[in-house]
Structures are given as C-alpha cells and as structure tokens.
C-alpha cells in the first residue's frame, strides 16, 4: 500500500500527506480538516505569541482527536547594522507615506518567542513539532524527545539533511526550490543559499539519510504525491495546495492572485522579510531589487515592511504586499481541505489501478 510506511506509523496518520505550517495562513479548521481526513494538519506558529499558540492548540483539539503538528521558526543568528535600518527606512518612506503609516519601532523577540513556543508545545503535549530556518539546540531537542514529541526538520540541500539527522530529527522535509513562501535554508555553501528542485533534491537526500524523507515544493495533487514516493520520499508536505483552500486564513486577494497566476509568475526575493521566499512578482519586489544587497536580514526587514504589507492587503493592493506561492498555481483549487485530501487519494488510487 502506498500510504503505509514508517512515516505514517511514526506520526499516527492514515495518509502521508502533511499540510505545511504556513505562518499567518493556517486556521484551526484547516489543521483539523486535514487531520480528520487522515493527513497531518500543522499549525503555523511562526508569528504567534504564547497565548495565541495555546488558544490555537486548544481550538484544534476541539475539532479533532487525531494527530497534528506545530511549525516553529528556529531563531536566526544574523547580524545587521544601524545604517542598514536607517537606509531601509529611507527607502520605505514613500510607501509608508502613500499608506499613511508611521515608521515602526523594531522589536526583536525571536529567542524569547521560540523558547515560549517550545514550552507551550511540551506543556500541551503536541504530537509533532516541525522546524524551519535551522536546527534547535541539543537541549531543546532533548526536552522535546523526553516529552515523546516527534520532530521534523527542514532541508534544502543534502548537507542540511545530514545535519538534521545528526541532530536527532525523526524525519526531514526536503524542500525543493519550487516551494512557495520562505526557503528553509540554514547552511550557505560559498555564501549562496541552495536552490535545488524537488525531483533532484529528494532522491539525493533519500540516499544519504536513514530517517523518512518528506518531499515538498510544487506538489499539488495525486500525481505529485505518487511521483515523490517513487523518488524515495515516504510522504509529502503541501503548502500552496492548502493555501487557496476555503479553510485557510489566506485573504481573497492572495487566493485570487494564486488561482489566476501562471507557473512563470513567481520569483524568489528577500524584499519583504529579509529571508529568501517565493511569491508572485509585483511592484514592491521589482522596486526593491535595486537594494537587494543592502536589505537587512530577517527578522529586521520583516518588521520594517510588516505595516506596509498589512495596510496594502487591507485595501486590496497586491502590488505592495507579499503573495507567497509555489510554482504550480495552475493546479490550485478553492476546495475545502478535506476535499483536497480525498481528491489526492482518489487520483493516486486511480493512477495505480491503471499501471
């Protein structure tokens, strides 16, 4: 059976389909719907404070008794200068003026937020914890394992996958360059982040690690799931496929933009957050490209542009806000999450029946 393997057993799920923990875009209904359909729903906790995460976990538990996960951001060890911030504020001034916004006071609470997330995940006995942007400390991994929480890391290269396995991850997401949203990269060979496609990355990681590999990037339907399994993955993680679902927290602006875009419309940019992320190209990205080498690292840039993005989204201006999307938008639907999962399963079974 295509849906019975080490990953499904480890995560206590029926189908090896994981809904990506997209920060700011998941809802309890989305998470629970995927879990109730036999997959693994994941809370995107990246921007939550402690109370928000606790409330989200409690709400999900009201909607499902099945396994689910929480995705957290590992704090970045980045450096920045005051002149970088001053310059960026000057460059962003016209956008703020147009939207009647004040210059924000930057508050960096990454470390404290991450610590609180881990404490909450342990306290609430969340079954699965997923990491993006790196690998947590040995002590944090030990605490989570002692609480019998399964750990999933993210890798965009073979070296990152090896590092995840050595650190004690139970499974690894192999994030191909087709994936929408932030790149999970944390190692920089020759100071350049990896941009390896899913079909190339997955088998190369599978060949060098002993733990289950989860394919991610451009996977939208049963064909992509089955292809990933053929490549050696034991499961898939899907983001954009669920982002356009009726059950996600995506705005109608973003949902419509993805549904109406083409495979050639996305770019990878640091303009919005200071970390590379794939989204639909727009005026803000193009105008900020001239400052590409001077953009402060995450989370500074994320803080500096946050109010601009929110204000633009509120007035329906897709040219000044982030529009995260993978490279397979033509395959996106607005179906409820449970329908998306059942369609994937039916398509796989149909393909296997005729092979």
UniProtKB/Swiss-Prot annotation:
Leading EC class: oxidoreductase
Domain of life where this protein originates: Bacteria
Record note on cofactor: Binds 1 FMN per subunit.
Residues annotated as binding FMN: 71, 175, 180, 218, 237-240
UniProt-listed CDD domains: NPD_like
Catalytic function, reaction form: 3 propionate 3-nitronate + 3 O2 + H2O = 3 3-oxopropanoate + 2 nitrate + nitrite + H2O2 + 3 H(+)
InterPro entries found in the cross-reference section: Aldolase_TIM, NMO
Coiled coil: none
Pfam families: NMO
Function: Nitronate monooxygenase that uses molecular oxygen to catalyze the oxidative denitrification of alkyl nitronates. Acts on propionate 3-nitronate (P3N), the presumed physiological substrate. Probably functions in the detoxification of P3N, a metabolic poison produced by plants and fungi as a defense mechanism.
Note: P3N is a potent irreversible inhibitor of the key enzyme succinate dehydrogenase in the Krebs cycle and electron transport chain. P3N has been shown to be a toxic metabolite to bacteria, plants, fungi, mammals or any organism that uses succinate dehydrogenase.
Name of the protein in its database record: Probable nitronate monooxygenase
UniProt organism field: Staphylococcus aureus (strain MSSA476)
